[in-house]
Amino acid sequence: MSMLPSFGFTQEQVACVCEVLQQGGNLERLGRFLWSLPACDHLHKNESVLKAKAVVAFHRGNFRELYKILESHQFSPHNHPKLQQLWLKAHYVEAEKLRGRPLGAVGKYRVRRKFPLPRTIWDGEETSYCFKEKSRGVLREWYAHNPYPSPREKRELAEATGLTTTQVSNWFKNRRQRDRAAEAKERENTENNNTSTNKQNQLSPLDGGKSLMSSSEEEFSPPQSPDQNSVLLLQGSLTHPGATSYSLSALSASQGSHGLQGHQHQLQDSLLGPLTSSLVDLGS
């Protein structure tokens, strides 16, 4: 531990001061402290000093300087979460200034896609809802085994995934809600399909009902209007009451016959008999 030239602190002490001022939120004082550091390359390449410079640049709205710092040095993984927040928040602020309104979830997603995290502060693993895929895999595997972990199990999961107990609890709660909603939707679709099937089954007989009705109408339709022979027969029957019973019986027989030709012959026989009798009576 050697003292820095013309400066009363060692490199480790400088790093400690930067961390203490950051945690205390004394960012203006931190900025003045960084400005007072001597021009020493190995001091200004110290990770704690670089992180402090990034925090001060964000605090002052100097986002270009912030991006330059974050992209020019390979930071340790334990510093990634803090520096990733600075990167994203800075891009959110710039996007909100351009659009003139706060960003929603979709707007922030588009910003993240447009300005992906640099590999200097990101290990390259995809994240989803701020959870790494490895952490989500652990949670999904446990959920399949037990959707309701105990408080002790939640603490163990938090340690295994690097998340907080609250984050683990919220993940399980949200996952259960999504599954319940999916089950309710599936039941609704099943009920709708069953209802549709029942309606189709009820309507199916009507498809053939038309032909049944048609045949019924034809079967029970009134007989055709009497032809000219039938009219003459009726007139002859009315003129000669003695032949009425014979004519009516012949008419009934003609109605019961299905063949058109037989129907006509029977009408002629029934007609000629009474007419002949009538002519004989008139001649006498």
UniProtKB/Swiss-Prot annotation:
Keywords: Activator, Apoptosis, Cytoplasm, Developmental protein, DNA-binding, Homeobox, Nucleus, Repressor, Transcription, Transcription regulation. GO terms for biological process: apoptotic process; cranial skeletal system development; DNA-templated transcription; ectodermal placode development; inner ear morphogenesis; otic vesicle formation; regulation of skeletal muscle cell proliferation; regulation of transcription by RNA polymerase II. It is found in: Nucleus; Cytoplasm. This is Homeobox protein six1. Belongs to the SIX/Sine oculis homeobox family. Residues 124-183 bind DNA. Its main location: nucleus. Transcription factor that is involved in the regulation of cell proliferation, apoptosis and embryonic development. Depending on context, functions as a transcriptional repressor or activator. Required for the normal formation of pre-placodal ectoderm. Residues 191-202 have a biased composition (Low complexity). GO terms for molecular function: DNA-binding transcription factor activity, RNA polymerase II-specific; RNA polymerase II cis-regulatory region sequence-specific DNA binding. Residues 168-230 are annotated as: Disordered. It comes from the Eukaryota. Gene3D superfamilies: Homeodomain-like (1.10.10.60). GO terms for cellular component: cytoplasm; nucleus; transcription regulator complex. Residues 179-190 have a biased composition (Basic and acidic residues).
